[in-house]
């Protein structure tokens, strides 16, 4: 057993059906509608935390947002968000998984589920909670009991063959983000090839190409999030 920084126990090696069932309910125990929860996963260094930061900056003036980060043994991602002041400190909570990242977002969601519920209690009502996974491989996916939709972030520096390789993260995420497009000429990645391969793997599921070197770079992802929020509120 490991613990989150706030002392929340995280039991490894088995699933939790009950929390997943509770989380899937769109209403809180008091009858109010809970926040939309969107998970962000992807390999180490693909730009997940930078994407979370950019989304917070883009959406925070119109929406009530909170973030849960996941790291194996540190608070590094949460500390990055705090240092860059993308949200007030009370709206950012870190979970130290102590195990493979996918364990905490798929196999045993108890610590993350408690973190999102604590945030709703502390700073709610919230419109949106972003749950960032620790860096993982192409098979990483979120439990449907933890998030309502998931974004999978890859980057061109990892190779333009990643969409073709597939894996559940690439093929099933509600949105695939191909990040760091500004680096494509320097690493020999063919963006058109990546788009075609992603289309073959994902069918009609959307793909966004981003470069976060400017504030406008997160625009396609922010637009997708706004559409999810509109559907959630309908």
UniProtKB/Swiss-Prot annotation:
<comment type="similarity">
    <text>Belongs to the SIMIBI class G3E GTPase family. UreG subfamily.</text>
</comment>
<comment type="function">
    <text>Facilitates the functional incorporation of the urease nickel metallocenter. This process requires GTP hydrolysis, probably effectuated by UreG.</text>
</comment>
<keyword id="KW-0547">Nucleotide-binding</keyword>
<dbReference type="InterPro" id="IPR003495">
    <property type="entry name" value="CobW/HypB/UreG_nucleotide-bd"/>
</dbReference>
<keyword id="KW-0342">GTP-binding</keyword>
<protein>
    <recommendedName>
        <fullName>Urease accessory protein UreG 1</fullName>
    </recommendedName>
</protein>
<dbReference type="GO" id="GO:0016151">
    <property type="term" value="F:nickel cation binding"/>
</dbReference>
<dbReference type="Pfam" id="PF02492">
    <property type="entry name" value="cobW"/>
</dbReference>
<dbReference type="GO" id="GO:0005525">
    <property type="term" value="F:GTP binding"/>
</dbReference>
<dbReference type="GO" id="GO:0003924">
    <property type="term" value="F:GTPase activity"/>
</dbReference>
<keyword id="KW-0963">Cytoplasm</keyword>
<feature type="region of interest" description="Disordered">
    <location>
        <begin position="1"/>
        <end position="29"/>
    </location>
</feature>
<dbReference type="GO" id="GO:0005737">
    <property type="term" value="C:cytoplasm"/>
</dbReference>
<feature type="binding site">
    <location>
        <begin position="42"/>
        <end position="49"/>
    </location>
    <ligand>
        <name>GTP</name>
    </ligand>
</feature>
<keyword id="KW-0996">Nickel insertion</keyword>
<keyword id="KW-0143">Chaperone</keyword>
<dbReference type="InterPro" id="IPR027417">
    <property type="entry name" value="P-loop_NTPase"/>
</dbReference>
<dbReference type="InterPro" id="IPR004400">
    <property type="entry name" value="UreG"/>
</dbReference>
<dbReference type="GO" id="GO:0043419">
    <property type="term" value="P:urea catabolic process"/>
</dbReference>
<comment type="subunit">
    <text>Homodimer. UreD, UreF and UreG form a complex that acts as a GTP-hydrolysis-dependent molecular chaperone, activating the urease apoprotein by helping to assemble the nickel containing metallocenter of UreC. The UreE protein probably delivers the nickel.</text>
</comment>
